[in-house]
Amino acid sequence: MIKTFKHKGLEVFFTTGKTKGIQADHARRLSRQLLALNDATQAADMDLPGWRLHPLKGELAGHWSVRVSGNWRLTFRFIGEDAELVDYQDYH
């Protein structure tokens, strides 16, 4: 289950469906990814074809990333069976 968001626009999108805080053309894919993340109990549950799940390094060590589109990524970490600090970023 998703416990916390780092990106406020992503949190609004997840709770209301409003796309104001995200790239509108990413809405469909983000919706699928957020629903999957909300059901996930470990990072491996997000290892779906085309999502390119991978662990992050450096300052984001302990976080995971899945590809949304181009350079955009959905990043998160798991504490127990819950996802937290869910972020939507262009970090490349």
What is the predicted function of each stretch?
Residues 2-4, 41, 61-68, 78:
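Alpha-helical interaction segments
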Residues 6, 49-52, 87:
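A secondary-structure boundary/capping signal
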Residues 27-41, 46:
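PIN-domain endoribonuclease scaffold, especially VapC-family toxins
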Residues 32-35, 54, 74:
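N-terminal, well-ordered alpha-helical segments
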Residues 41-64:
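A short, surface-exposed loop/turn module that caps and links secondary-structure elements
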Residues 64-92:
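Enriched for short, Lys/Arg-rich terminal
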